Amino acid sequence: MSRSIHWHTPSLRVNDGRGLSVRRVEYLRDSSGAEAERLVTRQRYNPAGLQIAQWDPRHGGDAFPNQSHVHTLTGEPLKIDSVDAGWRLTLPGLAGEALQRWDGRGQHWLSTYDEQLRVVAVGVEGEPALETFTYADALADATHNLRGQMTALNDLSGTLTCDSFSLLGGSQAQTRIFDDDRPHRSQQTFGPLNQVLAQTDAGGHRQTLHYDLAGQLKQVGLQLASDTSAQAVVQDARYNAAGQLIERLGGNNVRSRWQYDPANGRLASLQAAVAGQPSLQHFAYVYDPVGNVLRIEDQTFQPVYFANQLIDGHRDFDYDSLYRLTRASGHDALPSPDAPGRPQPSDPANLRNYTQHYDYDSGGNLIKLAHGREVGGYTRQMLVDPGSNRALRWQTGDPAPDFSRFFDSHGNQRKLQHGPQLQWNAQDQLQQVTLLKHDNGLPDDREVYLYSQGERVSKRQESHTASTTHFLQVRYLPGLEIRTRDNGEELHVITLPGHVRCLHWQAKPPADIDNNQLRYSLDDHLGSSLLELDQRARVISRETYYPFGGTALWLPSSSASVDYKTVRYSGKEMDVSGLYYYGSRYYAPWLKRWVSADSSHEDGLNLYGFVKNNPMRYVDPDGQAGLDFSSLLNLFRTTANVASQAHDIATEFDGEDEANVSQSTRATMTFRRFLFSKKGMTAFSLSATVGTAIGGAAGSFAPVIGNSIGGVVGGLIGGLAGAYIRYRFFKRGIQVAEALHTADLRDVTRTIADGAEDVANGAIPRVIQDRLTQLKESAANLIFDQVKEWNPLDQLDFAQMIEMGNSINDAYRAIMDRASIALPQLASPNETAAEQTVEPERSQSRGQVVLELNRSGQFERPAGSVREQGLAGRANSYRRATRAPRRQTRFESAV
């Protein structure tokens, strides 16, 4: 990374008098010596402090913002309008539930609830319900823990019934029926902490899982339905003190090792080998100071000279001042086609070095890719809709396309240029891909998808000739994929932990493939499948990828194995269309972008951009937001019992019974009063404890944060967000343990992850920006205004003194006495009394103390003022010490 690229490219944030961020200014430079371009992102708020509009740098002068919001009087979102994803309007009920919804596709949605505000039906007006839910009542069988649980779901994919639950709510037995009326029953056994101990899939194959004392997965066994004993799939696994996987021994005796930099927790090397044999995989990683991958060295690659070139197997990467990938080099043997479809096997004789250059517009759209290669180079461009971020393949001189023909009003792409047509269902899920249109009266070749609860559960590929119809049907079940063909073949693909898949044919397997073949995948840091091995550690296939997911090299060991590799880039399944299924969306690797807009609006204002245009650092687990692979994913991936831990915390979080709390008390309770009540302090303490641990762990991965600062910020995020959530639940009389289902847990986890990531990138976490303004009534503004001007060490000493039981006044006087500065009158007697009533206990976390210091929120300043805070100061000190060319960040107030 060149220092000159990052010289004088700060990131600035401008706040208004309420402490709300109204401008974010970034400076872009992509080459040494070039002038930095100023990029301004704008936000607008209503009088209540709620955000109502946002403009990215590309649309900064437009009349229409990228996103606009209309809120109810209570602050709930009523309408969201996006230039990428269209508009959606929600009519909430008295308890905040979504009763009716309208959208830009002309659909009027109706939701029906029972007396406990549980959804019982969802559908479009004038049509049968798309989803219906059935819940067990008080008369249900208590021995199977059914009472209050959802026991049946009917949707377009068929029927799902749940017969038994664990004590902590895990589904122990479920049956799914598709349109063929064949029941598929899956069973799970849970431990006392709700971890899965055993799973029997719909094919009768049984997985057993064993854990160490810390609850981390240690061993995995598999017993096929036709076998009488189990075989080891994962023989052993070890973890370091931070919970990171450091060693795993597979059932094929391949030992994989992960080494991490002790200074920051980043992956330093990845190695896999059978004892006494040459390494099968050995990568070494080089990073810049902020965590961008600069170089990947392949130590197992044998350098070759070909066509007057040295091909050494290493890969190098360059970035602009916004940390977007601008250059990548490596080697390939399969120039990426500019069309849909699966990759074809490579010709090893065509191996060459390549260099790719990437250009972006001010909205973050990748508009040009130049692929430099001795033979087979190319340049590809995208034309972006002037009024949105919708884009299409285009070359200079081509007429401008009609974007309305290629995208619907919700931003779903209807046709891939020079490729298939895409059809979307009412829920904006890809329903059908037309692979080939027949003009001779035959039905079109197509692939059709069905979903349940937001996840794909079935796909069917059909192709037609004049004499016959061929099909491939895939059913997705817990731990199992059932793949059937028109020739009678039925393949059970058993998915196991440790990146292992077992191929079990009910009848005779294809030639050159053993039945019950175990396929072990050796992945890179992004989870991409690079090397497939069988149970004897023999190589089945090798594959490498370009940075944005296209296949650069694919060498299968036999033609028979070609059709049975489905999981590829980033550990995702590639369909016959060439699209990757991520869960919430589909990704087109040849376009380097999603084919539908991000309906969650979680990953920035560009709803089509892929992993912040930094695909070597970020991964997207489900198609909603890019996360740093080396920090957040490792952090949350090692938590084996998230669901049970969240349930236990939520139960304690709820605290005492609230049945006797009057409605008038709930109605008049303010957030500040609640925060300093017993319930509020309990909620903050519990949430801050969890947040401090997460923040500290995040700090170990991001040196700009540091463990202590990470813990403080994590405590502040966790405590404040948790207390606010508990306050809202208190106002409505809802218990967290009942309300936090899987989707909510995912959203809360992502909020914490986003907060940690914001800090790592030198920004105030969004959750703090959104919530701190509600804590503005403090009795000690004078003290805090002065404390925030101190250096970070004095601030930490001040926090420690309060943590030890000293009052705010005493701690302030002690620091000032140490500096031999005359003390002013600090507070009136009433203010002092107010401080003492909320004085923290000795056992409270430092994150809670920081909240005490900042409970007045982001201090009011004249609009447009910019100040550098303590966290940024510490980050700058770190950068000076490491000489990191990181852009400086300025904030309005101090943590």
Over which residues does each language-model region extend?
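Thioester-forming pentapeptide GCGEQ
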Residues: 1-41, 46-47, 170, 176, ...
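Acidic/glycine-rich beta-solenoid
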Residues: 31, 60-71, 84-85, 105, ...
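Carboxylate/His-rich catalytic cores and anion/metal-binding grooves
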Residues: 40-55, 164-165, 471-493, 531-553
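Short turn/helix-capping motifs enriched in Asx and small/polar residues
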Residues: 354, 537-554, 578-579, 584-585, ...
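A motif-centric feature for acidic-aromatic and gly/ser/thr-rich catalytic loops and repeats
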Residues: 510-583
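Membrane-active amphipathic alpha-helices enriched in small hydrophobic residues
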Residues: 632-650, 654, 667-737, 744, ...
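Amphipathic, membrane-inserting segments
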Residues: 736-857, 861-864
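Intrinsically disordered, low-complexity, serine/threonine- and charge-rich segments
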Residues: 840, 853, 859, 865, ...
